[in-house]
Amino acid sequence: MGENQETQKSFLETVKFDSNGLVPAIVQDHETGKVLMMAWMNLESLKMTLEKKKACYWSRSRNKLWLKGESSGNMQEVHDILIDCDGDTLLLKVSQKGGACHVGYHSCFYRRTVDGESMEICDTLMFDPEEVYGKQS
């Protein structure tokens, strides 16, 4: 398919959802390029994100739509959405308010391996999850 034909397809037609109706979305800070998180989107959450310019995902554990920041206030303003060459992965470029990670860090990728076995924290703690979400039982 030539470039002109490819760009004429609608964005939503190009997205290849998996057998569960989901597509992975990598989330990146639009200014720094830092990867903040990975989440899943279904058609409804993707349409909502496109409409509101606020990141909305599909929670597999809760089996419902999840507007990022609805509990914590740590919203993601969406600046751009890119799709990969296969159409099966999205990249959201966002402005992150507060931390992206539910355990309080700026990025969900807040740990790195030191020697292949041990880990160290390599990111900034932005909030105390107990203060934001309450104590989890």
UniProtKB/Swiss-Prot annotation:
Record: residues binding Mg(2+): D84, D86, D88
Cofactor note: Binds 1 Mg(2+) ion per subunit. Binds 1 zinc ion per subunit.
Location, primary (coarse class): cytoplasm
Cofactor: Mg(2+); Zn(2+)
Annotated transmembrane regions: none
Alphabetized GO MF terms: magnesium ion binding; phosphoribosyl-AMP cyclohydrolase activity; zinc ion binding
Subcellular localization: Cytoplasm
Listed InterPro entries: PRA-CH, PRib_AMP_CycHydrolase_dom, PRib_AMP_CycHydrolase_sf
Gene3D superfamilies: Phosphoribosyl-AMP cyclohydrolase
Binding residues annotated for Zn(2+), in chain numbering: C85, C101, C108
EC number(s) recorded for this UniProt protein: 3.5.4.19
Signal sequence coordinates: none
Single Gene Ontology BP annotation: L-histidine biosynthetic process
Pfam family, one: PRA-CH
A Gene Ontology term for the protein's cellular component: cytoplasm
Pathway(s) annotated for this protein in UniProt: Amino-acid biosynthesis; L-histidine biosynthesis; L-histidine from 5-phospho-alpha-D-ribose 1-diphosphate: step 3/9
Catalytic activity entry: 1-(5-phospho-beta-D-ribosyl)-5'-AMP + H2O = 1-(5-phospho-beta-D-ribosyl)-5-[(5-phospho-beta-D-ribosylamino)methylideneamino]imidazole-4-carboxamide
Keyword field: Amino-acid biosynthesis, Cytoplasm, Histidine biosynthesis, Hydrolase, Magnesium, Metal-binding, Zinc
Listed HAMAP family: HisI
Function: Catalyzes the hydrolysis of the adenine ring of phosphoribosyl-AMP.
Subunit details: Homodimer.
NCBIfam families registered for this protein in UniProt: PRK00051.1 (NF000768)
Family from the record: Belongs to the PRA-CH family.
Protein name: Phosphoribosyl-AMP cyclohydrolase
Organism ancestry: Bacteria, Pseudomonadati, Chlorobiota, Chlorobiia, Chlorobiales
